[in-house]
């Protein structure tokens, strides 16, 4: 059996290109469920720790399906642009042999879900709307694994596989806090697309000469500290410019960083904020040296950021 870091193993093995669904209720988030899996797959052990998994082999899955073994109650996977911490143990359905497992709780790197779609895309719809804190068993028939998936796993072509996923953490796809009223004049305004992506409207007039920030959405999640490793969306524009110089939205997934390692104005603005919040930040032109180095921001101009705080790792 191979034991791989979570990012490597799940990137290679687990297809999670997920479609959107409502996070409000499990009933509005249908997942293809096959209750027969429960009669042939057994996974024991605490959630978040490597489970002992057995399969009553030879098991020949007739169709792809999912069975929830532990039902979580946290954030649901609702977008293919989210980040997540996921562990997985994989078994050969025909022999019951364990093929690969991640390191379980040792990896604190949040993985973009779109990156987890490479080898076995047929897993994608089976994890739709799975909640943080859930352990799910997924059975994939050989016909859905395909030659590439079988080779990646090390099973004979035509044989199926069983995956047991522990979904340790699911990060927000966008800030979901309550809108806040701000009376400050001279600050940019923010508009949002349906998926939450912000657009920045720069007002007429000169930029502020001191760093300023506003909370424009207030979340109710964990409080961010200077030592926090945060998952954030960032949209950055130069004052008066019409195009972004930095955009995790355009990159396709949020980023992860330690707050104290961010440019000073950004770090100061989000420290003390809560997960789910969206923060508007203006950095005067004479304070952008760190932004130029870290984010390739343009020189000699004020900068404007919108930061969505999507979660704290650890």
Set out the residue ranges of the language-model regions:
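Cross-family detector of peptidyl-prolyl cis-trans isomerase
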Residues: 2-314
């Amino acid at each position: 059996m191979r034991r791989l870091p979570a990012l490597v193993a799940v990137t290679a093995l687990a297809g999670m290109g997920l479609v959107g669904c409502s996070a409000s209720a499990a009933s509005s988030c249908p997942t293809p469920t096959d209750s027969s899996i429960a009669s042939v797959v057994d996974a024991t052990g605490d959630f978040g720790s490597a489970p002992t998994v057995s399969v009553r082999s030879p098991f020949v899955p007739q169709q792809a399906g999912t069975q929830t073994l532990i039902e979580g109650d946290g954030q649901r996977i609702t977008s293919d642009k989210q980040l997540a911490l996921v562990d997985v143990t994989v078994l050969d359905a025909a022999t019951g042999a364990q093929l690969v497992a991640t390191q379980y709780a040792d990896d604190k790197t949040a993985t973009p879900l779109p990156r987890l779609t490479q080898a076995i895309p047929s897993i994608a719809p089976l994890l739709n709307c799975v909640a943080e804190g859930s352990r799910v068993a997924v059975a994939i028939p050989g016909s859905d694994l395909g030659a590439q998936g079988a080779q990646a796993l090390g099973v004979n072509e035509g044989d199926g596989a069983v995956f047991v996923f522990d979904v340790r953490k699911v990060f927000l796809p966008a800030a979901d806090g309550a809108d806040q009223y701000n009376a400050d004049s001279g600050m940019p305004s923010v508009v949002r697309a349906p998926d939450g992506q912000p657009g920045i409207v720069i007002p007429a007039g000169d930029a502020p000469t001191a760093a300023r920030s506003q909370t424009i959405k207030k979340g109710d999640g964990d409080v961010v500290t200077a030592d926090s490793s945060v998952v954030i969306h960032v949209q950055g524009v130069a004052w008066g410019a019409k195009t972004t110089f930095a955009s995790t939205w355009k990159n396709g997934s949020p980023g992860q960083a330690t707050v104290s390692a961010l440019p000073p104005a950004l770090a100061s603005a989000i420290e003390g904020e809560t997960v789910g919040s969206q923060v508007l930040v203006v950095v005067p032109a004479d304070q952008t040296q760190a932004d130029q180095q870290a984010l390739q921001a343009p020189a000699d101009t004020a900068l404007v950021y919108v930061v969505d705080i999507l979660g704290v790792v650890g």
